[in-house]
Amino acid sequence: MRVLEEDLFPSTPGKVKIERAGAMNRQLHRCFASTSTMFLWALFLVAMTASYLSFQSFVDTSSKYFAASWGGLHWERQIRASAAPRRPPGSAAGAGMSVLVTGAAGFVGTHCSLALRKRGDGVVGVDNFNAYYDPSLKKARRALLASHGVFVVEGDINDGRLLAKLFDVVPFTHVLHLAAQAGVRYAMENPASYVHSNIAGLVTLLEACKDADPQPAIVWASSSSVYGLNDKVPFSERDRTDQPASLYAATKKAGEEITHTYNHIYGLSITGLRFFTVYGPWGRPDMAYFSFTRNILQGKPITVYRGKDHVDLARDFTYIDDIVQGLPWIFNLGNTSPVTVPNLVSILEKHLRVKAKKHVIEMPGNGDVPFTHANISLAREQLGYKPTTNLDVGLKKFVKWYLSYYGYTRGSKNSRQ
């Protein structure tokens, strides 16, 4: 599927753009009067207060550290060079865009930054390179981006001074906001980090965009986790999202309400996306397919959870290239073909040529949901979105990358890990 370049992001920056149908808008307005939405707003206010109190000293310290890594004439030249579009003169697609990508050294951020650069857009990345998973993988992604002319600033999206400086140096036309604290189970032990990144960080970025001249159009990553305990499948954009099953899901839902408000009050052009279990090369080590691959190759047992009544868990696995092609819209982005976790393991075993040592147990109450299933009809109708990579093909590509990146050879358990 080929998509016109000018359609890949929201229209002219600064214009109000609401993607949902009129009926949906009326439903949202009514929602503000509902008890569930009042709860979400209360959660947001409490979260913002907690974030300020818990992280004030952290922000002061980290801002001083990151400030030492940005600024100066050489740094500004790097920013301008990276942000400059490189489409040929007279291109039918136009002059190109200048895009600020937050979370650029992350899994999805890296792939999106590369795709934007390859089509001739200017790209500047921001990432804090935290230790949620092995930072060396993020640094390797940064090196990959640098080889394609994308400069990634090491900094935190909660640093308003950094964001203001970036918008002062470059009049970005678009912002692709992918920075967030990911993971469902990690939130059980580190709740403050989710409030800090997913709520306070989002607000800091929106404030910077609101004050920028011109105001950039914004695309940001929500999550399929907002559907929470919803038992109606497949999940549709019109389904209820007031039953979060985890703190991560609650922060993403709060983000949707916050962005709606900034669109309503300040006219910011904001488009949100709900990703469904993205996988592929350069992926996140905390994801099941990644950790299964590592443990299978090392001869270690893998833990496979089952739901109530011994029902296998299932996920709507979506290959990264399919996410990239549909990224610039506010729709469910999935594969609409859920696959059970045992089937995922079987496919990995086939491509790794190693039998997994499985340990099957009941799913604990840690915020995970038993299944995800995307209804992509809206994206298909209005965008022409059509995922093309099934799980077997996608995992084959992932395994090829994994074996190469970590230095495995067939039949050997030795690697760089």
Regions found by a protein language model. Give the residues of each.
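N-terminal Rossmann-like NAD(P)+-binding domain of SDR-like oxidoreductases, especially those catalyzing
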Residues: 2-278, 321, 325, 385, ...
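NAD(P)-dependent short-chain dehydrogenase/reductase
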Residues: 229-234, 247, 257-329, 345-352
